[in-house]
Amino acid sequence: MLTIGTALRADATRVMLLGSGELGKEVAIECQRLGIEVIAVDRYADAPAMQIAHRSHVINMLDGDALKALVEAERPDYIVPEIEAIATDMLVTLEKQGHHVVPCAEATRLTMNREGIRRLAAETLGVPTSTYRFADSEESFRQAVEAIGYPCIVKPVMSSSGKGQSLIRSAEQLDKAWNYAQQGGRAGGGRVIVEGLVNFDFEITLLTVHAVDGIHFCAPIGHRQEDGDYRESWQPQQMSALAQERAQKMASDVVKALGGYGLFGVELFVCGDEVIFSEVSPRPHDTGMVTMISQDLSEFALHVRAFLGLPIGAVRQYGASASAVILPELESNNVRYQGLESALLPHTQIRLFGKPDIGGKRRMGVALASAETTEDAVEIAKRVAAGVTVSG
């Protein structure tokens, strides 16, 4: 039987968030709703989740010794990674010492690295994927591109939000693509994956929950990407019954192989009735922010409920809904927002993340909308997002 202690008391139940951005902030809010003590950690001060946590710490989470020292000092009941840039080998060590890593340390280690999860999916589980090669030098990169053929995509094996990714259509782009991949890796330069292009009708995120009462699926989420990052997402994405069945089977196999309780964002390509695996994150997914308006339990609530060992039961989807990012471009450490009075249309919501500064283009908020159709919901969400003026 689960016992939840009271925050800031001797028997408090403590959650340590490794990563304190907008997704971590929503996880922190769901923890707070259950009276859980939240410790927010990130590499910069005043990150969104830090603003609502009981305590916060600024460390380099790629420094295993610093991470270990902080965990030993705080003694959290649950260590919840919310980003990829973490010393995952140290998480494996901490788990062996008795600490609870969500969903488990091995899942975090494998999915931080595109090579680990791709080899698990394609070579161990036999899941359909794009053609791929790995390279760790410019020479082997060129050989990989030659083997895959044009056009192809290159990505650092460790990166997020499209950083370091390029579409290569000709040999003239190789130098630029290699250098960009080396700049975009989470842990600096290094190994890359070269992938062949996949013919698909659309991409989905299938939020998959592994909980004490089994595997649960949210309705498929469609999304539009630009510059490697999502701009709008919508739920439900319409797809054939056979494709949805195959997607759920694929997601279930991958999630069970990774292990541990929590919510996983499984990214898939869909072409007719065929489904091809792309990636998986063992945590809430940015495209899943639409669930803050589309479901009775958001992806963040589902994640917390699952890793605490609580049953999910069922997830109720309210109907056509969408999200659109608020993505300004400016330089400021004193950001201000205007226009909400006119931007907030009926059946819409706005989330401003509270990021302390902006240097260039940065996702600072999200607009949420519900409507009769997903197409209408997307257009309304985009209109709401465009109505928010960001200055500094």
Curated annotation (Swiss-Prot):
Annotated binding of ATP, by residue: R114, K155, S160, S161, G162, K163, G164, Q165, E195, G196, L197, V198, E203
> One Pfam family of this protein, by short name?
PurT_C
Q: Which reactions fall under this protein's catalytic activity? A: N(1)-(5-phospho-beta-D-ribosyl)glycinamide + formate + ATP = N(2)-formyl-N(1)-(5-phospho-beta-D-ribosyl)glycinamide + ADP + phosphate + H(+)
What are the binding positions for N(1)-(5-phospho-beta-D-ribosyl)glycinamide in this chain? E22, L23, E82, D286, K355, R362, R363
Write out the residues that bind Mg(2+).
E267, E279
HAMAP family the record matches: PurT
**Top EC class, one word:** ligase
Residues of the ATP-grasp domain: 119-308
Chain coiled-coil ranges: none
Q: State the function annotated in the UniProt record.
A: Involved in the de novo purine biosynthesis. Catalyzes the transfer of formate to 5-phospho-ribosyl-glycinamide (GAR), producing 5-phospho-ribosyl-N-formylglycinamide (FGAR). Formate is provided by PurU via hydrolysis of 10-formyl-tetrahydrofolate.
Q: What is its EC number?
A: 6.3.1.21
What name appears for this protein in its UniProt entry? Formate-dependent phosphoribosylglycinamide formyltransferase
